[in-house]
Amino acid sequence: MSLSYSNVLNINKKNYNGVTIEEKALSGKINIRGKSSDKEFMKNIGSVLNLVLPIEPNVRIFNNNISIMWLGPNEWLVETPENEKDEIISLLESKLNPEKTAITDVSFNKTVLRLEGEKVFILLSKFLVANLEKILETNFSVAQTIFIKIPILFIRNNTDKEEISLDLHLNRSHAKYVYDLLVDGSKNLNI
């Protein structure tokens, strides 16, 4: 029997004082751990994902359907279309040495909120000490931090010439709480 799951909030894209918020459609999320200094590991990952794992902090790389985020020196998050996740996990398991690596399906415990608009960083600054606008100034960069006592992965989706777009990867159990805070915080963005 296969488990199934759905979005947590089931909300459509809504605009709140210049910031749109939506819960992204479900996607596959695979946590990979291994040594970036292990050439065989890096080669095998590359052959399965058709991408080279980023080894620089706060970097995201992507191709058609797959996105890889650097989480730490020996840890990455791979985001895939939901319908391709199981096949990718199977291929990774067949190529990687299980004694030196770990592959974990984390799709069921994470959801993604997308924030877009010119006031996104103003809204987030109400809840963070860190200056996300500075931290995420590079196109398609990532940052992990604690957001109102909740660990969140922030991903910048836009280039300099595009509207600000951030994805917030967070635990499903915190989604409603964070969403309500963001909606409430958006009521006065004239800082």
What kind of feature is each model-predicted range?
Residues 1-191:
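Basic, glycine/lysine-rich polyanion-binding surfaces/domains
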